[in-house]
Amino acid sequence: MELVPSARAELQSSPLVNLSDAFPSAFPSAGANASGSPGARSASSLALAIAITALYSAVCAVGLLGNVLVMFGIVRYTKLKTATNIYIFNLALADALATSTLPFQSAKYLMETWPFGELLCKAVLSIDYYNMFTSIFTLTMMSVDRYIAVCHPVKALDFRTPAKAKLINICIWVLASGVGVPIMVMAVTQPRDGAVVCMLQFPSPSWYWDTVTKICVFLFAFVVPILIITVCYGLMLLRLRSVRLLSGSKEKDRSLRRITRMVLVVVGAFVVCWAPIHIFVIVWTLVDINRRDPLVVAALHLCIALGYANSSLNPVLYAFLDENFKRCFRQLCRTPCGRQEPGSLRRPRQATTRERVTACTPSDGPGGGAAA
């Protein structure tokens, strides 16, 4: 199997989207066989493409449907009145965008070429980076939000408001645009070995900027946010162990601890799913390893697929960890357009005359971001 040039080739591509172009020294060019002649394909390459397509199809179906249900449920039932719900909506939006690109990537694997043109190439590559940064930034802010709710309940009344949460979400997308827009500009389609590839074209020297990009992504989309999250949960753990009642109400405390656990599990799932590919990319870039080893190549594909799988995992976690989300999902599936059935899925709760509160909300408390 003829291998394409080294990782410092003049044209580099995204490490997380167009996988066969991400690390050119490891993957065969489209249509290359063992003798180097175009037009043939090995059985192992075809089997890998079929396996990836099947996996991506499942991730796309579960992730797109699940995240759309999350967004619709939040808008329909909570009117975005709580800080936690607003952050969850932002996370679901980023995940839905990421899973929407998987059909294009599956087609690229099966066809061994990029048939969708440069405009979609730019969209797919930039969405990948937008998802990466908006997801971890949102999870970081959710952890900070939990820290303030647990450790500074008085300050939470002022900080954890819907308006401020929406403003923070806007800032998250603006910060992510600092990476997403340059990626969109650098994304190009280029002919290679009789096929078309969608890749990133870095300025000269391309190998230098490619390495700098990978290191910056590793630091700012993984290491630094994880450190902030770790500090927040470390301080929360100390607080939860030292104080029996955080809010003066046992019911409110149970809600507070339940939401904190849910956010921690979602953050943990993100770390488990994304740590392998981040570490793999850094090792691949900085360490001299055998990039032609089939096991290394297979491990890389597995790590990338695991990162994408995280986008379909969050709605499942919400359904299992939060009873209100579970009831909300059931109602959305049973009732056309999410209309509330009289008496269904409701428990006795206090509600103001200005806002009708239903049970189909994350357990964040009614009507305000500081409730829990």
Swiss-Prot record:
Tissue expression remark: Brain, with high concentrations in the basal ganglia and limbic regions.
Membrane is among the record's keywords: yes
Molecular function terms, GO-annotated: G protein-coupled enkephalin receptor activity; G protein-coupled opioid receptor activity; receptor serine/threonine kinase binding
Annotated glycan sites: N18, N33
Disulphides: C121-C198
Matching PROSITE patterns: G_PROTEIN_RECEP_F1_1, G_PROTEIN_RECEP_F1_2
Entry's transmembrane regions: 48-75, 86-110, 123-144, 164-186, 207-238, 262-284, 300-321
Summary of the knockout phenotype: Mice are born at the expected Mendelian rate; they show no obvious phenotype and are fertile. Mutant mice show decreased analgesia in response to opioids, such as deltorphin-2. They do not develop analgesic tolerance to morphine.
Keywords tagged on the record: Cell membrane, Disulfide bond, G-protein coupled receptor, Glycoprotein, Lipoprotein, Membrane, Palmitate, Receptor, Transducer, Transmembrane, Transmembrane helix, Ubl conjugation
Pfam family, one: 7tm_1
Cytoplasmic side: 76-85, 145-163, 239-261, 322-372
Family listed: Belongs to the G-protein coupled receptor 1 family.
Alphabetized PANTHER family for the sequence: DELTA-TYPE OPIOID RECEPTOR (PTHR24229:SF2), NEUROPEPTIDES RECEPTOR (PTHR24229)
Protein name according to UniProt: Delta-type opioid receptor
Native species: Mus musculus
Top-level taxonomy: Eukaryota, Metazoa, Chordata, Craniata, Vertebrata
